[in-house]
Amino acid sequence: MVYILGVAVNDDKPVRFALLSFYGIGHAKAEEICAKLSFHNTLRVRELTNVQLTTLSQLLSGMTIEGDLRRQRNADISRLVNIRCYRGMRHVNGLPVNGQNTRTNAKTAKKLNKVPRRGYMTLSPASTRPITWSFCLPRMVSVFQKLKHIH
C-alpha cells in the first residue's frame, strides 16, 4: 500500500485504476491525469519513481478531491436547504431531487438524500425501566376496574 495525500492506494493496480480510489476522480479524470503525466496504460503504482509520485501528489493536491469535495457538496446541499428552494426541500424530505419518479423507484433516493440530523433524544429513567409484571400490574388492575364499572 502506498499512501498518496492520505489515501491508501493499492500497489498492484495500474495507476489509472488506482486513481479511482480518490473520491472525486472518475475514469475520464484518471485518464486525463495519466496523459498529462505521460504514464502508459499498464504502469503500476509500485513501478512509479519518487519523482513521479511527487508530481502526481502535486497535481492531485491542486484538485478539489476527497474531504474538500465532500465539504463543498455538503455546503451546496445545506445552502439549498437554507434558502428553502424546491431542491433543498426534496433533500430534507429524502426524495429524488432531479425530477425522477416517486411512485416506484425512489427507494435509493429515500435512503441517500436525507439531510443528516444532529438532534439528540434523551430517555427518561422511567422509559428505560424494563417492563415487568410488577410494573404492569397496577395499570392492568385499573383497566379491569374501569371495564367492571362499565358493565
UniProtKB/Swiss-Prot annotation:
<dbReference type="InterPro" id="IPR001892">
    <property type="entry name" value="Ribosomal_uS13"/>
</dbReference>
<keyword id="KW-0496">Mitochondrion</keyword>
<dbReference type="GO" id="GO:0019843">
    <property type="term" value="F:rRNA binding"/>
</dbReference>
<keyword id="KW-0694">RNA-binding</keyword>
<dbReference type="Pfam" id="PF00416">
    <property type="entry name" value="Ribosomal_S13"/>
</dbReference>
<dbReference type="InterPro" id="IPR018269">
    <property type="entry name" value="Ribosomal_uS13_CS"/>
</dbReference>
<keyword id="KW-0687">Ribonucleoprotein</keyword>
<dbReference type="GO" id="GO:0003735">
    <property type="term" value="F:structural constituent of ribosome"/>
</dbReference>
<keyword id="KW-0689">Ribosomal protein</keyword>
<dbReference type="GO" id="GO:0015935">
    <property type="term" value="C:small ribosomal subunit"/>
</dbReference>
<protein>
    <recommendedName>
        <fullName>Small ribosomal subunit protein uS13m</fullName>
    </recommendedName>
</protein>
<dbReference type="GO" id="GO:0005739">
    <property type="term" value="C:mitochondrion"/>
</dbReference>
<dbReference type="InterPro" id="IPR027437">
    <property type="entry name" value="Rbsml_uS13_C"/>
</dbReference>
<comment type="similarity">
    <text>Belongs to the universal ribosomal protein uS13 family.</text>
</comment>
<comment type="subunit">
    <text>Component of the mitochondrial small ribosomal subunit (mt-SSU). Mature yeast 74S mitochondrial ribosomes consist of a small (37S) and a large (54S) subunit. The 37S small subunit contains a 15S ribosomal RNA (15S mt-rRNA) and at least 32 different proteins. The 54S large subunit contains a 21S rRNA (21S mt-rRNA) and at least 45 different proteins.</text>
</comment>
<dbReference type="GO" id="GO:0032543">
    <property type="term" value="P:mitochondrial translation"/>
</dbReference>
<keyword id="KW-0699">rRNA-binding</keyword>
<comment type="function">
    <text>Component of the mitochondrial ribosome (mitoribosome), a dedicated translation machinery responsible for the synthesis of mitochondrial genome-encoded proteins, including at least some of the essential transmembrane subunits of the mitochondrial respiratory chain. The mitoribosomes are attached to the mitochondrial inner membrane and translation products are cotranslationally integrated into the membrane.</text>
</comment>
<dbReference type="GO" id="GO:0005763">
    <property type="term" value="C:mitochondrial small ribosomal subunit"/>
</dbReference>
<dbReference type="InterPro" id="IPR010979">
    <property type="entry name" value="Ribosomal_uS13-like_H2TH"/>
</dbReference>
